[in-house]
C-alpha cells in the first residue's frame, strides 16, 4: 500500500506571520544571500549559500563556477530546489522564563524547478546576470574594462518560483 504525503510547500503554522506576496518579493530584491537546497541521488540534502538576482516576476537567478560538483550533480539528478533567504534581528527577552523570549526575523522560502543555462546561447542571459550582480553587490565607484571574457566559465541557474512563502516576526510574541 502506497501513501502519498501531503504537499506542505507554502504552508505556515502561524498565519499572522504570513507576508503579503509583494512584501516577500521586495524582501527577495533587497537581501544578499540565498541558501539553496538540493537533494543528492542517495536522498541526502545539500545546502549551499549563493548570491542571487531577483527583479520581480517568477524567476530567481544564481550562478556557480563551471566545474561539476555536488550542487550541479544534484541538479542533474533532480531539478527541484528550495531556496531560503532570511534576515535575523534581535532576541526580545521573555518573562518570566527564558523560553518566552522571541527572535525578530524575516524569511522567504521559494520552491520550484531550476533550469541550467550554459553554452554559447546563454551568453546574453549570463551578461545580463553579471551586470545585475555587479550593480547589486559592487560599489558605484568601481570601473572595469567592458565585457566578460570568463563568461563561459560560469553556469547560470534560472529557478521558476512555483511556491513562495514569506513570514516575519516582530519578536514580541511566539
Mark where each language-model region is.
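Charged, gly/pro-rich active-site loop segments
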Residues: 1-16, 88-174
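Short, basic/aromatic recognition patches
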Residues: 7-35
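A generic structural signal for nonpolar/aromatic side chains embedded in well-ordered alpha-helices
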Residues: 28, 74-75, 133
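Short solvent-exposed loop/turn micro-motifs enriched in small/polar/acidic residues
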Residues: 29-31, 44-46, 101, 151-152
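Short beta-strand segments
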Residues: 31-66
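A generic structural signal for short beta-strands and their flanking turns/coil linkers
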Residues: 32, 48, 58, 77-84, ...
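A short mixed-secondary-structure module that forms the rim of ligand-binding clefts
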Residues: 53-91
Amino acid at each position: 500500500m502506497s501513501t502519498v504525503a501531503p504537499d506542505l510547500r507554502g504552508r505556515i503554522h502561524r498565519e499572522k506571520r504570513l507576508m503579503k506576496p509583494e512584501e516577500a518579493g521586495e524582501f527577495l530584491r533587497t537581501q544578499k544571500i540565498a541558501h539553496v537546497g538540493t537533494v543528492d541521488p542517495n536522498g541526502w540534502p545539500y545546502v549551499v549559500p549563493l548570491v542571487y538576482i531577483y527583479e520581480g516576476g517568477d524567476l530567481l537567478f544564481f550562478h556557480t563556477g563551471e566545474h561539476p560538483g555536488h550542487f550541479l550533480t544534484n541538479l542533474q539528478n533532480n531539478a527541484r530546489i528550495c531556496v531560503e533567504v532570511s534576515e535575523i534581528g534581535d532576541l526580545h527577552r521573555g518573562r518570566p522564563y527564558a523560553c518566552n523570549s522571541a527572535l525578530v526575523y524575516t524569511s522567504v522560502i521559494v520552491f520550484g524547478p531550476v533550469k541550467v543555462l550554459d553554452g554559447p546561447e546563454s551568453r546574453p542571459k549570463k551578461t545580463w546576470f553579471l551586470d545585475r550582480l555587479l550593480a547589486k553587490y559592487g560599489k558605484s565607484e568601481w570601473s572595469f574594462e567592458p565585457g566578460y571574457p570568463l563568461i563561459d566559465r560560469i553556469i547560470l541557474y534560472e529557478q521558476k518560483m512555483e511556491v513562495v512563502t514569506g513570514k516575519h516576526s516582530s519578536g514580541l510574541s511566539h
